[in-house]
Amino acid sequence: MTATIIDGKETAKEKRGQLAKEVEELKKQGVTPGLAVILIGDDPASLSYVRGKKKAAEAMGIRFQLDHFDASFTEQELLEVIDQYNQNDDFHGILVQLPLPDHISEQAVIERISPEKDVDGFHPLNVGKMLLGEDTFLPCTPAGIVELLKKTEIDLSGKEVVVVGRSNIVGKPVGQLLLNENATVTYCHSRTADITAHTKKADILIVAVGKANFIKADQIKEGAVVIDVGVNRLDNGKLAGDVDFEEAKEKASYITPVPGGVGPMTITMLAHNTVKSAKRTIQL
Protein backbone atom coordinates (compact mmCIF):
# COMPACT_ATOMS: atom_id res chain seq x y z
CA MET A 1 0.00 0.00 0.00
CA THR A 2 1.21 3.49 -0.82
CA ALA A 3 -0.60 6.25 1.02
CA THR A 4 -2.72 8.90 -0.64
CA ILE A 5 -1.07 12.28 -0.07
CA ILE A 6 -3.27 14.81 1.74
CA ASP A 7 -2.46 17.93 -0.25
CA GLY A 8 -2.57 20.88 2.14
CA LYS A 9 -1.60 23.34 -0.59
CA GLU A 10 -4.60 22.39 -2.74
CA THR A 11 -7.06 22.45 0.17
CA ALA A 12 -5.64 25.80 1.32
CA LYS A 13 -5.94 27.21 -2.21
CA GLU A 14 -9.63 26.26 -2.39
CA LYS A 15 -10.36 27.73 1.04
CA ARG A 16 -8.42 30.93 0.26
CA GLY A 17 -10.45 31.35 -2.94
CA GLN A 18 -13.64 31.17 -0.87
CA LEU A 19 -12.28 33.64 1.68
CA ALA A 20 -11.27 36.12 -1.04
CA LYS A 21 -14.90 36.14 -2.24
CA GLU A 22 -16.13 36.71 1.31
CA VAL A 23 -13.69 39.62 1.70
CA GLU A 24 -15.07 41.16 -1.52
CA GLU A 25 -18.62 40.91 -0.13
CA LEU A 26 -17.53 42.55 3.13
CA LYS A 27 -15.83 45.38 1.25
CA LYS A 28 -19.10 46.07 -0.61
CA GLN A 29 -20.61 46.68 2.83
CA GLY A 30 -17.81 49.03 3.83
CA VAL A 31 -15.78 46.58 5.92
CA THR A 32 -12.21 45.58 5.01
CA PRO A 33 -10.99 42.74 7.25
CA GLY A 34 -7.82 43.89 9.01
CA LEU A 35 -5.08 41.82 10.65
CA ALA A 36 -2.41 43.37 12.90
CA VAL A 37 0.72 41.29 13.48
CA ILE A 38 3.28 42.23 16.13
CA LEU A 39 6.78 40.77 15.89
CA ILE A 40 9.46 41.19 18.55
CA GLY A 41 13.09 40.48 17.63
CA ASP A 42 14.63 38.83 14.56
CA ASP A 43 14.06 35.10 14.94
CA PRO A 44 14.54 33.77 11.36
CA ALA A 45 11.65 31.28 11.58
CA SER A 46 9.31 33.98 12.93
CA LEU A 47 10.33 36.38 10.16
CA SER A 48 9.61 33.69 7.59
CA TYR A 49 6.19 32.90 9.11
CA VAL A 50 5.23 36.57 9.18
CA ARG A 51 6.21 37.01 5.52
CA GLY A 52 4.01 34.03 4.66
CA LYS A 53 1.09 35.51 6.60
CA LYS A 54 1.48 38.89 4.89
CA LYS A 55 1.59 37.41 1.39
CA ALA A 56 -1.43 35.17 1.98
CA ALA A 57 -3.53 37.83 3.73
CA GLU A 58 -2.92 40.45 1.05
CA ALA A 59 -3.69 37.94 -1.72
CA MET A 60 -7.14 37.47 -0.13
CA GLY A 61 -7.71 41.23 0.16
CA ILE A 62 -7.16 41.41 3.92
CA ARG A 63 -5.53 44.60 5.25
CA PHE A 64 -2.24 43.54 6.86
CA GLN A 65 -0.28 45.67 9.32
CA LEU A 66 3.09 44.53 10.71
CA ASP A 67 4.61 46.22 13.75
CA HIS A 68 8.19 44.94 14.10
CA PHE A 69 10.11 45.89 17.25
CA ASP A 70 13.60 44.91 18.36
CA ALA A 71 14.23 42.30 21.05
CA SER A 72 14.71 44.92 23.80
CA PHE A 73 11.05 46.04 23.50
CA THR A 74 9.53 45.75 26.99
CA GLU A 75 6.46 43.81 28.04
CA GLN A 76 4.72 47.02 29.11
CA GLU A 77 5.40 48.63 25.73
CA LEU A 78 4.01 45.57 23.97
CA LEU A 79 0.86 45.54 26.12
CA GLU A 80 0.29 49.20 25.24
CA VAL A 81 0.53 48.42 21.51
CA ILE A 82 -2.01 45.60 21.98
CA ASP A 83 -4.33 48.02 23.83
CA GLN A 84 -4.19 50.41 20.86
CA TYR A 85 -5.19 47.65 18.43
CA ASN A 86 -7.93 46.44 20.79
CA GLN A 87 -9.49 49.91 20.42
CA ASN A 88 -8.88 50.24 16.66
CA ASP A 89 -11.98 49.26 14.67
CA ASP A 90 -9.97 48.98 11.44
CA PHE A 91 -8.37 45.77 12.74
CA HIS A 92 -10.45 42.67 13.41
CA GLY A 93 -7.58 40.37 14.32
CA ILE A 94 -4.48 40.81 16.48
CA LEU A 95 -1.64 38.31 16.46
CA VAL A 96 1.58 38.47 18.47
CA GLN A 97 4.12 36.17 16.82
CA LEU A 98 5.44 33.55 19.23
CA PRO A 99 7.92 32.74 20.70
CA LEU A 100 8.60 35.96 22.59
CA PRO A 101 11.88 37.01 24.27
CA ASP A 102 12.34 35.61 27.79
CA HIS A 103 11.60 38.93 29.50
CA ILE A 104 8.04 39.02 28.10
CA SER A 105 5.30 36.78 29.54
CA GLU A 106 3.48 34.96 26.73
CA GLN A 107 0.46 34.41 28.96
CA ALA A 108 0.19 38.09 29.88
CA VAL A 109 0.33 38.99 26.18
CA ILE A 110 -2.23 36.37 25.12
CA GLU A 111 -4.63 37.49 27.85
CA ARG A 112 -4.26 41.18 26.92
CA ILE A 113 -5.58 40.62 23.38
CA SER A 114 -9.34 41.19 23.22
CA PRO A 115 -11.11 37.79 22.93
CA GLU A 116 -13.11 39.33 20.04
CA LYS A 117 -9.85 39.89 18.12
CA ASP A 118 -7.96 36.77 19.25
CA VAL A 119 -7.64 35.20 15.80
CA ASP A 120 -4.96 32.78 17.07
CA GLY A 121 -7.58 31.24 19.39
CA PHE A 122 -5.23 31.29 22.41
CA HIS A 123 -7.16 33.54 24.84
CA PRO A 124 -8.45 31.53 27.85
CA LEU A 125 -12.02 32.63 27.08
CA ASN A 126 -11.81 31.22 23.55
CA VAL A 127 -10.05 28.06 24.76
CA GLY A 128 -12.91 27.55 27.23
CA LYS A 129 -15.51 28.00 24.50
CA MET A 130 -13.65 25.49 22.33
CA LEU A 131 -13.73 22.95 25.20
CA LEU A 132 -17.48 23.44 25.47
CA GLY A 133 -17.94 23.10 21.71
CA GLU A 134 -19.25 26.67 21.41
CA ASP A 135 -18.74 28.91 18.39
CA THR A 136 -15.40 30.69 18.79
CA PHE A 137 -12.02 31.34 17.17
CA LEU A 138 -10.31 27.95 16.93
CA PRO A 139 -6.50 27.68 17.08
CA CYS A 140 -5.28 27.79 13.49
CA THR A 141 -3.15 24.65 13.17
CA PRO A 142 -5.64 22.34 14.93
CA ALA A 143 -8.54 23.80 12.92
CA GLY A 144 -6.51 23.29 9.73
CA ILE A 145 -5.87 19.66 10.66
CA VAL A 146 -9.60 19.02 11.15
CA GLU A 147 -10.31 20.62 7.74
CA LEU A 148 -7.73 18.33 6.10
CA LEU A 149 -9.21 15.25 7.79
CA LYS A 150 -12.69 16.22 6.62
CA LYS A 151 -11.37 16.59 3.05
CA THR A 152 -10.41 12.91 3.11
CA GLU A 153 -14.09 12.18 3.84
CA ILE A 154 -13.11 9.95 6.74
CA ASP A 155 -15.86 9.67 9.36
CA LEU A 156 -14.14 10.88 12.53
CA SER A 157 -16.87 9.58 14.84
CA GLY A 158 -15.71 6.59 16.86
CA LYS A 159 -12.17 6.61 15.45
CA GLU A 160 -9.15 5.95 17.66
CA VAL A 161 -7.07 9.13 17.52
CA VAL A 162 -3.60 9.32 19.06
CA VAL A 163 -1.98 12.74 19.45
CA VAL A 164 1.78 12.67 20.08
CA GLY A 165 2.56 16.02 21.71
CA ARG A 166 0.63 18.09 24.26
CA SER A 167 1.46 21.73 23.51
CA ASN A 168 -1.19 24.38 24.10
CA ILE A 169 -0.82 25.47 20.47
CA VAL A 170 -1.35 22.14 18.68
CA GLY A 171 -1.47 18.94 20.74
CA LYS A 172 -4.07 19.74 23.39
CA PRO A 173 -6.49 21.68 21.16
CA VAL A 174 -6.42 19.27 18.20
CA GLY A 175 -7.33 16.41 20.54
CA GLN A 176 -10.19 18.47 21.93
CA LEU A 177 -11.52 19.36 18.46
CA LEU A 178 -11.50 15.69 17.48
CA LEU A 179 -13.20 14.78 20.76
CA ASN A 180 -15.88 17.30 19.75
CA GLU A 181 -16.19 15.26 16.51
CA ASN A 182 -16.86 12.13 18.64
CA ALA A 183 -13.43 10.53 18.16
CA THR A 184 -11.78 8.61 21.03
CA VAL A 185 -8.61 10.55 21.83
CA THR A 186 -5.37 9.49 23.54
CA TYR A 187 -2.48 11.88 24.24
CA CYS A 188 1.15 10.73 24.27
CA HIS A 189 4.04 12.89 25.47
CA SER A 190 7.59 12.79 26.84
CA ARG A 191 6.47 10.98 30.01
CA THR A 192 4.45 8.29 28.19
CA ALA A 193 6.02 4.94 29.10
CA ASP A 194 5.45 3.15 25.77
CA ILE A 195 4.47 5.49 22.94
CA THR A 196 4.47 2.69 20.33
CA ALA A 197 1.85 0.71 22.26
CA HIS A 198 -0.49 3.66 21.74
CA THR A 199 0.48 4.77 18.23
CA LYS A 200 -0.02 1.27 16.82
CA LYS A 201 -3.69 1.40 17.85
CA ALA A 202 -4.35 4.72 16.11
CA ASP A 203 -6.77 4.96 13.20
CA ILE A 204 -5.63 8.59 13.01
CA LEU A 205 -2.14 9.52 14.23
CA ILE A 206 -1.25 13.18 14.75
CA VAL A 207 2.39 13.96 15.54
CA ALA A 208 3.52 17.36 16.85
CA VAL A 209 6.75 17.02 18.84
CA GLY A 210 9.34 19.00 16.85
CA LYS A 211 11.76 16.09 16.37
CA ALA A 212 12.73 15.06 12.84
CA ASN A 213 11.60 11.57 11.78
CA PHE A 214 10.56 10.77 15.37
CA ILE A 215 7.85 8.28 14.36
CA LYS A 216 8.85 5.29 12.20
CA ALA A 217 6.70 2.95 10.10
CA ASP A 218 6.81 0.15 12.69
CA GLN A 219 4.97 2.45 15.12
CA ILE A 220 2.07 2.98 12.72
CA LYS A 221 -1.01 0.80 12.29
CA GLU A 222 -1.53 -0.57 8.77
CA GLY A 223 -3.92 1.76 6.93
CA ALA A 224 -3.79 4.59 9.49
CA VAL A 225 -4.22 8.25 8.59
CA VAL A 226 -1.03 10.14 9.52
CA ILE A 227 -0.99 13.90 10.13
CA ASP A 228 2.55 15.27 10.50
CA VAL A 229 2.65 18.71 12.12
CA GLY A 230 6.44 18.94 12.55
CA VAL A 231 8.69 21.20 10.51
CA ASN A 232 12.37 20.46 11.20
CA ARG A 233 15.41 21.62 9.24
CA LEU A 234 17.99 18.87 8.73
CA ASP A 235 21.76 19.40 8.56
CA ASN A 236 21.58 19.23 4.75
CA GLY A 237 19.14 22.16 4.76
CA LYS A 238 16.10 20.10 3.79
CA LEU A 239 12.84 20.14 5.74
CA ALA A 240 11.58 17.02 7.48
CA GLY A 241 8.49 16.29 9.51
CA ASP A 242 8.16 14.45 12.81
CA VAL A 243 7.26 11.27 10.89
CA ASP A 244 9.68 9.34 8.66
CA PHE A 245 7.70 10.08 5.50
CA GLU A 246 9.35 7.62 3.10
CA GLU A 247 8.77 4.72 5.50
CA ALA A 248 5.35 5.79 6.71
CA LYS A 249 3.80 6.31 3.28
CA GLU A 250 4.11 2.57 2.62
CA LYS A 251 2.08 1.79 5.75
CA ALA A 252 -0.51 4.57 5.99
CA SER A 253 -3.68 5.02 3.93
CA TYR A 254 -3.40 8.83 3.98
CA ILE A 255 -0.46 11.03 4.99
CA THR A 256 0.41 14.74 5.00
CA PRO A 257 3.77 15.71 3.48
CA VAL A 258 6.26 18.22 4.93
CA PRO A 259 6.30 20.81 3.52
CA GLY A 260 2.91 21.20 1.81
CA GLY A 261 0.68 19.44 4.33
CA VAL A 262 -0.50 21.12 7.52
CA GLY A 263 1.52 24.35 7.10
CA PRO A 264 -0.54 26.01 4.33
CA MET A 265 -3.72 25.35 6.31
CA THR A 266 -2.44 27.18 9.41
CA ILE A 267 -2.21 30.52 7.60
CA THR A 268 -5.50 29.84 5.81
CA MET A 269 -7.35 29.32 9.10
CA LEU A 270 -5.80 32.53 10.46
CA ALA A 271 -7.37 34.34 7.50
CA HIS A 272 -10.64 32.47 8.14
CA ASN A 273 -10.69 33.72 11.75
CA THR A 274 -9.91 37.30 10.65
CA VAL A 275 -12.78 37.26 8.15
CA LYS A 276 -15.06 35.70 10.79
CA SER A 277 -14.19 38.53 13.19
CA ALA A 278 -14.91 41.15 10.52
CA LYS A 279 -18.28 39.54 9.78
CA ARG A 280 -19.20 39.73 13.46
CA THR A 281 -18.89 43.52 13.34
CA ILE A 282 -21.84 43.65 10.94
CA GLN A 283 -23.59 40.58 12.41
CA LEU A 284 -23.22 38.41 9.29
UniProtKB/Swiss-Prot annotation:
Gene Ontology CC, one term: cytosol
Top-rank taxon, per record: Bacteria
Keywords for this protein: Amino-acid biosynthesis, Histidine biosynthesis, Hydrolase, Methionine biosynthesis, Multifunctional enzyme, NADP, One-carbon metabolism, Oxidoreductase, Purine biosynthesis
GO molecular function: methenyltetrahydrofolate cyclohydrolase activity; methylenetetrahydrofolate dehydrogenase (NADP+) activity
PROSITE patterns: THF_DHG_CYH_1, THF_DHG_CYH_2
Cited function: Catalyzes the oxidation of 5,10-methylenetetrahydrofolate to 5,10-methenyltetrahydrofolate and then the hydrolysis of 5,10-methenyltetrahydrofolate to 10-formyltetrahydrofolate.
Family: Belongs to the tetrahydrofolate dehydrogenase/cyclohydrolase family.
Subunit architecture: Homodimer.
UniProt protein name: Bifunctional protein FolD
Origin species: Bacillus licheniformis (strain ATCC 14580 / DSM 13 / JCM 2505 / CCUG 7422 / NBRC 12200 / NCIMB 9375 / NCTC 10341 / NRRL NRS-1264 / Gibson 46)
Upper lineage: Bacteria, Bacillati, Bacillota, Bacilli, Bacillales
